[in-house]
Amino acid sequence: MVKLTSIAAGVAAIAATASATTTIAQSDERVNLVELGVYVSDIRAHLAQYYMFQAAHPTETYPVEVAEAVFNYGDFTTMLTGIAPDQVTRMITGVPWYSSRLKPAISKALSKDGIYTIAN
């Protein structure tokens, strides 16, 4: 017969290995920071494409914090705090490759961090 303490220990071990999940609003700063992290990484990986997009759309501007993060190869997440959620959404969804490249990468990064979003 299995002891109750053995079952409890097994359940605790399983719970400890399962990744914690958090459900938060899409406008939450934690979501914004993950989105911006993916965005900055994408700009770094496809800089020429972003330069061409900027040249074709000169009114599409980026906050100075994003530009600094792109060219500062250290930890940039603290630079990106305080950017308004609507500005984050405008930037990441405003490029033609949002659906094909950014959205899947953002979803993967949020999932990896155990973050799930709900509509505001």
Curated annotation (Swiss-Prot):
Give the species this sequence originates from.
Saccharomyces cerevisiae (strain ATCC 204508 / S288c) (Baker's yeast)
- Keyword line: Membrane, Transmembrane, Transmembrane helix
Membrane topology term: Single-pass membrane protein
Q: Which domain of life is it from?
A: Eukaryota
Q: Tell me where in or outside the cell this protein is found.
A: Membrane
Q: Hey, which family's this protein in?
A: Belongs to the SRP1/TIP1 family. Seripauperin subfamily.
UniProt protein name: Seripauperin-4
User: Entry's InterPro entries?
Assistant: SRP1_TIP1, Yeast_SRP1/TIP1_CWP
- Membrane-spanning parts: 7-24
Q: Which coarse location class describes where this protein primarily resides? A: membrane
Query: What GO cellular-component annotations does this UniProt entry give?
Result: fungal-type cell wall; fungal-type vacuole; membrane
Gene Ontology molecular function, alphabetical? structural constituent of cell wall
GO terms of biological process kind: fungal-type cell wall organization
> Is Membrane one of the keywords?
yes
